[in-house]
Structures are given as C-alpha cells and as structure tokens.
Curated annotation (Swiss-Prot):
Keywords: Amino-acid biosynthesis, Branched-chain amino acid biosynthesis, Leucine biosynthesis, Lyase
Top-level division of the source organism's lineage: Bacteria
Subunit-structure text: Heterodimer of LeuC and LeuD.
Entry GO CC: 3-isopropylmalate dehydratase complex
Catalyzed reactions: (2R,3S)-3-isopropylmalate = (2S)-2-isopropylmalate
Name of the protein: 3-isopropylmalate dehydratase small subunit
Entry-linked SUPFAM superfamilies: LeuD/IlvD-like
C-alpha cells in the first residue's frame, strides 16, 4: 500500500521555467539504482550545484533560497517532465520532499508516473499559474492547501479548481499503487489458481 493522499498544505517554491525535462530533474548519471530512495540528493543536480560532486550549492537557484527550504509544493511552467521516460524523475521529486507539482501541462509519461508514485500533478490554466507565480513571488514563504477530495487549490483568499480522472483520484485517495490494486483481488486470484489444471501449477 502506498501513502494515502487526501489533502496537503505545504510551502510553495516557484520554478519559473518551461519544458523542464527529466534529465534536468534527475540527470542520467544518477540512474544506476532501481530502488526509489536516495534520488532527492540529486534532484535538479546541474542547476542546484556548481560542481560535479554536488558539494557547492548554486546560490542563484531557487531551491537553494533559504525562504523555500522544506518546500513540498513545486510551482512550474508548461510541459513539465518532458524528455526521456524515466520513473526516476518522480522518485527524485518525492524523495526530496515534494508532494504536489502545479503546472499548466505535463508530459504524458511523467504525468502517469507521478500517480504511480503518489506525487500529485495538478493542471491549471496558464493564466491561473501566472497568478500563482505572482502571488508566491510577492509572498515568499507562502503555503498552498491542495485538497484532492474537493479537487481545489487554496492560495491566500483564492480557490482554483482542478480535475483528476476518477480512477487515478480513487487510487491516490486510498493509497493504491499497482500492487495494492492487485492485492484487492487476491481472493479472486487465489480462486482462479486453485481451479487451474494440475499440469499448469
């Protein structure tokens, strides 16, 4: 079972860049592992650090600004997560501490991979995202409330509606990944296996 996602309130960091690809999110040299942990240290590695070893933080990169330390909601521009298909991208984001990414659009494969890893991708219009960028940049340290049950983002005195398809929403709300979904049918699977001819067992 994955962690259930119903509502999250968190600090927002504005990443004002369009077409952020998966190689920027987690560069290819860090993809040797197949476990989901340990990738947060290398999130946006080429932007966050000035050296190859990840020891000299780039003071001009927004994730390194002290007012955004501990951010769990990433605000981004269109076509977030484009590029090669790598599930390591949502792994890196969640391992770093992000629960939600808000953008006008997402690359299709990244969008699907996010739900598989309990990272909520929220799609709002360009105009709404522009509003949110202005709001966050004028109020560093601002928090948003993201309510998956109601499908709304609350930012200050404004509320923005978003839509997640019913199946993905059900899975997120109930903490169901592909394994969890399969286990829900464990009894039916066992019944089927018991009925198989002996030569198939």
């Amino acid at each position: 079972m994955a962690e259930k996602f119903t509502q999250h309130t968190g600090l927002v960091v504005p990443l004002d860049a369009a077409n952020v690809d998966t190689d920027a999110i987690i560069p290819k040299q860090f993809l040797q592992k197949v476990t989901r942990t340990g990738f947060g240290a290398h999130l946006f590695n080429d932007w966050r650090f000035l050296d190859d070893k990840g020891q000299q933080p780039n003071p001009d990169f927004v994730l390194n600004f002290p007012q955004y330390k501990g951010a769990s909601i990433l605000l981004a521009r269109e076509n977030f997560g484009c590029g090669s298909s790598r599930e390591h991208a949502p792994w890196a984001l969640t391992d770093y501490g992000f629960k939600v990414v808000i953008a006008p659009s997402f690359a299709d494969i990244f969008y699907g991979n996010s739900f598989n890893n309990q990272l909520l991708p929220v799609t709002l219009s360009d105009e709404q995202v522009d509003e949110l960028f202005k709001l966050v940049q004028a109020n560093p340290g601002m928090t948003f409330e993201v309510d998956l049950e109601a499908q709304v983002v609350k930012a200050g005195d404004k509320t923005y509606s978003f839509k997640i398809d019913d199946f993905r929403r059900h899975c997120m709300l109930n903490g169901l990944d592909s394994i969890g979904l399969t286990l829900q049918h464990g009894e039916a699977i066992s019944d089927y296996e018991r009925k198989l001819p002996a030569f198939m067992n």
